[in-house]
Amino acid sequence: MSSAEFSMDDFEDTFDSNATISTKDLFEGSDRLPLNQSINTTIQNLYLPNGGFAIGDQSQQQYYQAMPPLNQSDQFNLGRSNNLTPRTNQLQQLQQQQQQQQQPQQQQQQQTYGTQSPIHMSQTPSSPLSSPLPSPTPFSRQQSYNNNNSNNTSSSQNYNNNNININNNNNNNNTNNNNNNNNGNNSNGNNGNNNNNNNNNNNNNTNNNNNNNQQQQQQQQQQQQQQQQQQQQQQQGNPNLSSPQPILDTIYKLLSEQEQTLVQMIHEQSLLLNRLPPTLDENSLAPLKSLSQKQITLSGQMNTEMSALDATKKGMILEPTDLAKLFALKQDLQIQFKQLSLLHNEIQSILNPQHSAPKPNVALVLKSQPFPVVISKGKQLGENQLVVLVLTGARSNFHINGPVKATMICDSHPTNKNNPTTPLEMDSQPIYPATLTAHFPLKFLAGTRKCSVNLKFGVNIRDLDNVTTTVESDASNPFVVITNECQWEGSAGVLLKKDAFDGQLEITWAQFINTLQRHFLIATKQDPVRPKRPLSSYDLKYIQTHFFGNRSIIHQQDFDKFWVWFGKSMQTLRYQRHISTLWQEGIIYGYMGRQEVNDALQNQDPGTFIIRFSERNPGQFGIAYIGVEMPARIKHYLVQPNDTAAAKKTFPDFLSEHSQFVNLLQWTKDTNGAPRFLKLHKDTALGSFAPKRTAPVPVGGYEPLNS
């Protein structure tokens, strides 16, 4: 059976359409104006030419104009200086602004957990890029300024210490002089000398005290000015503190420049390597050393960008579109880092041949992947969902033997080691010479028993000495293959927990929610870039209040208790017929407490109802409605499994059949994004879910009944 014959109702039906969306499409799609405004304001902030982008809004321009201009010497082309770019400096400033914004949250955490906080996110390393490059020393202008301030502070401290020593010496002199006077040195000459010495010492003390007072006053004035500046920034409501757009757009611009820089590096490095003389000397190695230093500097810039992306994910709750942008940037950045590492390894094999590995300078990277996701046994990926890219250095002194092979691994071991059943089909694919890519429309033939697994890809490379070496890729994102839909809840929980915590015992609330939102959109089969109804800020507040005690730090044990309830609601949203669509249309209000329901139904007509998830019965719906009895009161009905147990009876059918339910309070949102109710008759709200019946064809002269 071909892939086209499968109904991709698990995740492929929605996810495949977005699998080939590039980072450029995400940032510069059909609607270019909003992006151009954002990029333009970022460029203005960095005082670089905008290249014809649209003008940003007035409030952002005013903020950027208030910033001090950069020195002309700080601006240069990537790969042609030992300093970081002004945009990287600005990236560090944006990170510092985010940290300042998160300080009140950290203070609240200290009040909650005490000084012995169970987690210190500032010490958590960012996602590592397996790079052989040494850690570069940052050369940002801002850090140099901070270093100068540190030196000035040290000098001030030394100066104060000197003053203290001088005062002590003078006091000792005064004491000695007084002792001399008491010991009977009564000659007029001696007395005059002593008096003069005392006067001089007193004058010195006065001068020193005046200097100390002036320094203290200057320090106090500087502190007051800094406090006033911070208060002004808080009053102005700087948009950079609450929006990820400046960081995301800046990194996107950097990625575009880095792509051009890498192409130039490959060309330059190829020329240098091809022109090397047989006997190497200092003059022939100097250009390679210079290029190697540029690569180290560029790797430092990439590390800064990766740290900024990780900090954004951990410190700020992102909208779905921004989440998609962040992961696309991270994917492209990892590929660029791998390419840079290959170029650097190639130079190091000449500069330091004794320390270089004798393997081909080739790498396999995942250009696109649909994971993390739960996949049903027998499903097949789309043609462009899983693509492997071959990267090389500046010289292609090797031959590729055979196709690229995919292997499923669990805990770093192949899953089919002791299993005779082959878990994958279409697991061997050729490399397209024009693009150096291999496309894997994998078909999954066996379940993974609720265990998360990964994919690795390998290819045989033969060098010029006819030595064959296997080159392997890094592991893919995790996924789980299930054999029955009843396994989905447990498998999705395993996958979400692994993806969110990544081996850590505790994570920030923002990091947890960003991961949950991503998995929720996949589970409800929504467009991950522009979903119709993701989890709103009010849904997230409900979750944080009811399951995590409004804490800003989430522990794995907290997650286990949360998933017992939330996982069942996700299972219902995913597999029960029409439920995902009912959620997206707002017919199911979703996550709402009983008291909130009672407040919403106050003063409503009899028959008005709201649909929500039951708080005490996970995965089931509760319907709150106004009864027809007098006096009217709010009733609550728990939808039973047998209410929709018939083969063709759906939840909309159940609502249509019961006269107690007349007018639906449908979830919608106002212009500010706040939820509100829209009152509709149930026939209007559920009309699209009614079964389509065709009129019978008249037979033998009989006429059909008219309704």
From Swiss-Prot:
The primary site where this protein sits is: cytoplasm
Q: How is it modified after translation?
A: Tyrosine phosphorylated in response to cAMP. Not tyrosine phosphorylated in growing cells. Tyrosine phosphorylation is first detected at the tight mound stage, continues throughout the slug stage and early culmination, and starts to decrease at mid-culmination. Barely detectable in fruiting bodies.
Q: What happens when the gene is disrupted?
A: Cells are hypersensitive to the chlorinated hexaphenone DIF. They form slugs, but there is little or no stalk cell differentiation. After several days of developmental arrest very small spore masses appear that are supported by columns of apparently undifferentiated cells.
Compositional bias per record (Low complexity), positions renumbered to this chain: 90-111, 142-238
Q: Mind telling me which GO cellular component terms the entry cites? A: cytoplasm; cytosol; nucleus
Region (Disordered) residue spans:
70-246
What is one Gene Ontology biological process annotated in the Swiss-Prot or TrEMBL record?
negative regulation of DNA-templated transcription
Q: Which InterPro entries does this UniProt record tie to the protein? A: EF-hand_12 (IPR041604), p53-like_TF_DNA-bd_sf (IPR008967), RHD_DNA_bind_dom_sf (IPR037059), SH2 (IPR000980), SH2_dom_sf (IPR036860), STAT (IPR001217), STAT_TF_coiled-coil (IPR015988), STAT_TF_homologue_coiled-coil (IPR015347)
DNA-binding stretch(es), residue numbering of this chain: 443-487
Q: Where in the cell is it found?
A: Cytoplasm; Nucleus
Q: For site (Interaction with DNA), what residue positions does UniProt give?
A: 380, 577
Residues in coiled coil = 242-356
A single GO molecular function term of this UniProt record: DNA-binding transcription factor activity, RNA polymerase II-specific
- UniProt lists compositionally biased (Polar residues) regions at 70-89, 112-121
Q: Which residues carry this modification: Phosphotyrosine?
A: 702
Where does the SH2 domain lie? Answer: 583-686
> What are the alphabetically sorted keywords of the record?
Coiled coil, Cytoplasm, DNA-binding, Nucleus, Phosphoprotein, Repressor, SH2 domain, Transcription, Transcription regulation
Quaternary data: Monomer, in the absence of tyrosine phosphorylation. Homodimer, or heterodimer with another family member, when tyrosine phosphorylated.
Name the family the entry cites.
Belongs to the transcription factor STAT family.
Q: What does this protein do?
A: Transcription factor that binds to 5'-TTGAATTGA-3' elements in the promoter region of target genes. Functions as a repressor of the ecmB gene. Regulates the differentiation of prestalk cells during development.
Recorded protein name is Signal transducer and activator of transcription A
> What is the native source organism of this protein?
Dictyostelium discoideum
